[in-house]
Regions:
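A short coil-to-beta-strand element that immediately follows conserved catalytic motifs
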Residues: 61-69
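Active-site-adjacent beta-strand/loop module that shapes the phosphate/pyrophosphate-binding cleft
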Residues: 71-94
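Short loop segments at secondary-structure junctions
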Residues: 15-17, 24, 89-94, 109-111
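Nudix hydrolase/Nudix homology domain
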Residues: 31, 99-136
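Structural detector for helix-capping/boundary residues
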Residues: 16, 38, 52, 65, ...
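A generic structural micro-feature
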Residues: 2-4, 32, 76-82, 101
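Conserved Nudix-box catalytic region and its N-terminal flanking loop in Nudix hydrolases
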Residues: 14-56
Length: 136
């Protein structure tokens, strides 16, 4: 049976840096660096789901959310992901990681390009994300 999954992620800014989190060894995509976020639960409001995922993965509260872009990808013949990527801001740089992640960095523009995987960088390029972010 075909499956559609809605994933939400956020580029979180604090002091002109972007939060990247590194996946744990047990998780799919192990050791990959990513921006925080995850799946929307049935019946959940979009921003409530985004806030929940960010709190679960980082312990942070965010504000000023703005939808930057949407994308879709077939990850298998029977599974499609719809992804929403937001921009938001953190009040603090004190991150508390969940078991899904093992490290984090408040990244500069150079670190973003070095650490993010190619599909995410391609999405950022397609939507001119690095051009609109006010980061060092």
């Amino acid at each position: 049976m075909a499956e559609l999954w809605l994933a939400q992620k956020s580029i979180i800014l604090y002091n002109r840096k972007v939060l990247l989190i590194q996946r744990s060894n047990y998780a799919s995509g192990e050791n990959d660096w990513e921006i925080p976020g995850g799946g929307l639960r049935f019946g959940e409001d979009l921003l409530e789901g985004l806030h929940r995922e960010i709190r679960e993965e980082t312990g942070l509260s965010v504000y000023g959310e703005k939808l930057l872009y949407a994308m879709t990808a077939l990850v298998s013949p029977q599974r499609q992901i719809v992804g929403l990527t937001y921009l938001s801001y953190a009040d603090s740089d004190e991150v508390t990681l969940s078991h899904e992640h093992k490290d984090y960095v408040w990244a500069s523009r150079k670190q973003l390009v070095e650490l993010l995987n190619k599909p995410m960088l391609d999405d950022f390029e397609k939507h001119s994300i690095l051009d609109i972010l006010d980061i060092d």
